[in-house]
């Protein structure tokens, strides 16, 4: 890592604007909530299954106490990455427009670019089958895809729920769906049949969560466009992920020492500053965030790939 020789003056007004920008389509925070740490590199503990071992705890009269020797701790190394994006404005553009409005718009572009990048990183990590063991993933074949009315998505989800319970002794409380996966699931005859029995209306994410006995169902609606803006692509594709997310504590803050499916370790939240170049004729608004997205508990997830035909 190079020397951080130049300190940046943060613009408080634009930083507050950046904090206020949030896209309802982004779901990375649900899977990989932000946990702030002080250093850009370090290690976080990987929790073992020692507490699941069945141990003889009976003790005879005057016998020695039973002893449990803790397993050696395993750690996950991390090194954060800096993400930054600047948007330029020529002084002539500034003269022809409302300065604050242009700066606010440029702040949106810069912060949105970083947020979309984080969403893509999260999707690639969560929906990559290589990140899961054999018991914690399935790729649906032709007859099992949710776009096939004869398939049984409820059974697939039930198997995933049981796989997680066997792995971590907790049932999953969340389901993340790509946008097209949600459409297929919400229109599936078996789901609509459950809806009819319950005498409910349209199958919303909230009703779907109730039917599947989950705390929440989240939909990844974010898209990206090609450089020529000719092609739109779903960030989250056509996959689904059952997972256990540890609820945040009373303060809402997260700690990497708490077991969880995943975390985003961050040194600081997004900040915005301004700098000039080209002899003072171009003013840049720049957004900066330092973080690393980590899948720390793959056993707490169950990936269902290729849900749609």
Feature-to-residue mapping (PLM):
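Protruding loop/beta-arch "assembly-hinge" segments enriched in small, turn-prone residues
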Residues: 1-37, 268-309
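Intrinsically disordered, low-complexity linear regions
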Residues: 2-25, 46, 133-134, 138-141, ...
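Short, hydrophobic/proline-enriched secondary-structure or compact coil segments at domain edges
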Residues: 14-23, 27, 31-32, 44, ...
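Assembly/oligomerization interface modules of large self-assembling protein complexes
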Residues: 20-85
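Generic recognition of long tandem-repeat/solenoid scaffolds
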Residues: 44-47, 69, 242-244, 285-287
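Alpha-helical scaffold segments that mediate packing/assembly in large oligomeric complexes
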Residues: 91-171, 179-192, 308-309
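Extended oligomerization regions of viral-like shell subunits
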Residues: 170-261
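Phosphate/anion-contacting hairpin/loop surfaces
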Residues: 174, 249-252, 265-269, 286-288
């Amino acid at each position: 890592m190079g020397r951080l020789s130049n300190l940046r003056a943060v613009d408080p007004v634009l930083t507050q604007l950046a904090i206020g920008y949030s896209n309802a389509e982004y779901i990375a925070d649900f899977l990989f909530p932000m946990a702030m740490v002080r250093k850009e590199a370090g290690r976080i503990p990987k929790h073992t299954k020692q507490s699941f071992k069945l141990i003889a705890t009976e003790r005879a009269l005057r016998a020695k106490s039973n002893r449990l020797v803790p397993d050696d701790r395993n750690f996950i190394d991390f090194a954060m990455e800096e993400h930054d994006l600047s948007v330029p404005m020529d002084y002539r553009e500034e003269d022809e427009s409302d300065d604050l409005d242009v700066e606010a718009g440029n702040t949106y572009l810069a912060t949105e670019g970083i947020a979309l990048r984080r969403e893509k990183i999260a999707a690639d990590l969560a929906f990559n089958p290589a990140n899961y063991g054999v018991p914690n993933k399935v790729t649906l074949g032709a007859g099992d895809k949710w776009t096939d009315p004869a398939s049984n998505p409820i059974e697939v989800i039930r198997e995933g729920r049981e796989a997680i319970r066997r792995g971590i002794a907790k049932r999953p409380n969340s389901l993340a769906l790509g946008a097209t996966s949600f459409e297929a699931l919400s229109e599936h005859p078996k789901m609509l049949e459950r809806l009819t029995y319950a005498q409910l209306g349209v199958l919303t994410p909230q009703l779907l969560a109730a039917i599947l006995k989950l705390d929440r169902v989240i939909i990844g609606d974010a898209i990206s466009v090609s450089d020529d803006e000719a092609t739109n692509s779903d960030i989250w594709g056509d996959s689904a992920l059952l997972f256990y997310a540890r609820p945040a504590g009373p303060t809402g803050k997260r700690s990497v020492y708490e077991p969880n499916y995943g975390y985003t370790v961050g040194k600081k939240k997004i900040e915005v500053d301004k700098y000039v170049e080209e002899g003072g004729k171009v003013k840049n608004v720049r957004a900066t965030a330092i973080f690393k997205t980590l899948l720390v508990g793959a056993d707490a997830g169950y990936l269902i790939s290729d849900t749609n035909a």
